[in-house]
Amino acid sequence: MLQLNSFAEISTLADRLPVADEAARAAALARQNSLTKPVGSLGRLEELALHWAAWRATERPTITKAQALCFAGNHGVCAQGVNVFPQEVTHLMVKNFEMGGAAINQLCRAAGADLQVISLDLDRPTQDFTQGPAMTEAETVAALNVGAGAVDVTADALIIGEMGIGNSTIAAALAAAIYGGTAKDFVGPGTGSDAAGIARKIAAIDKGLALHGGLGGMETLAALGGREIAAMCGAVLGARAARIPVILDGFISTAAVSTLFKVDPRLLDHCVVGHTSAEPGHQKVLTTMGKRALLQMEMRLGEGTGAALALGVVRAALECHNGMVTYAEAGITA
């Protein structure tokens, strides 16, 4: 299990964590090109098969076990009126997850993923980032380790998601800090903010950016992030250590791991993006990261729902890769 101790240690992780197995990728490509279909005709399904082959280090990868992790946290910046719901809703939604009543429960069941919901100090929100850093380095590293430690190293795929009132504000702040621009470039309605609510979000983010500009990736995570945001980053790193491909969800999870992208883009090489969120900042982030989402469903719920839906696409890709026969096996010659 990956154990992290400091931001300085994370800065060197890309040189020490496993990398894609290019021999397995090449073997999988050779198989793809011999199957009973025109080369490339399954489009991105073929790309997904090669991605899983490279990270699972086998020509014919399967998903025997898929894990979904949904991290929950609360945020001090909610004191600035950035959300229409009180923070108690985070508690209530966690209970809903645990009782099986949320969208993520249904989509994980449909996709064949085992869901775990992990709360991080819900009764102790982070600090208000308009007044100072949201977290200390020690608090951030602790949350990173919660995420890394939650990864089931026997899984073949990992979905990450989140729940936290106010965390669309956190995501917009992180995206603006990492990629540049203003709050207006990344702020959306979140859980239903009206024009006045959006104005409060923009004002809070602009104040946070003025206070915490010019920082490195992990320092930005501490200054503007949250515990569940850091835990998602930790899970991504823990999965990398175990060679488990990750399916990111929408805007919030992608903005979260942008802090890792800032540290070293290679830290996200094992990740695919499940869907393009309807939140306006998401496509801007994806374009800058150079990643294409698998689905466009106009979703913006979070929780890991878009990633869970995309897991079905990955499973379909691997079924084709492993179940189709080659031209030789079918007795077909050119």
UniProtKB/Swiss-Prot annotation:
Disulfide bonds: none annotated. Keywords: Cobalamin biosynthesis, Glycosyltransferase, Transferase. It comes from the Bacteria. The keyword Transferase applies. One of its GO terms (molecular function) is nicotinate-nucleotide-dimethylbenzimidazole phosphoribosyltransferase activity. InterPro entries: Nict_dMeBzImd_PRibTrfase, Nict_dMeBzImd_PRibTrfase_bact, Nict_dMeBzImd_PRibTrfase_N, Nict_dMeBzImd_PRibTrfase_sf. GO terms for biological process: cobalamin biosynthetic process. The active site is at E303. It catalyses: 5,6-dimethylbenzimidazole + nicotinate beta-D-ribonucleotide = alpha-ribazole 5'-phosphate + nicotinate + H(+). Catalyzes the synthesis of alpha-ribazole-5'-phosphate from nicotinate mononucleotide (NAMN) and 5,6-dimethylbenzimidazole (DMB). Belongs to the CobT family. This is Nicotinate-nucleotide--dimethylbenzimidazole phosphoribosyltransferase.
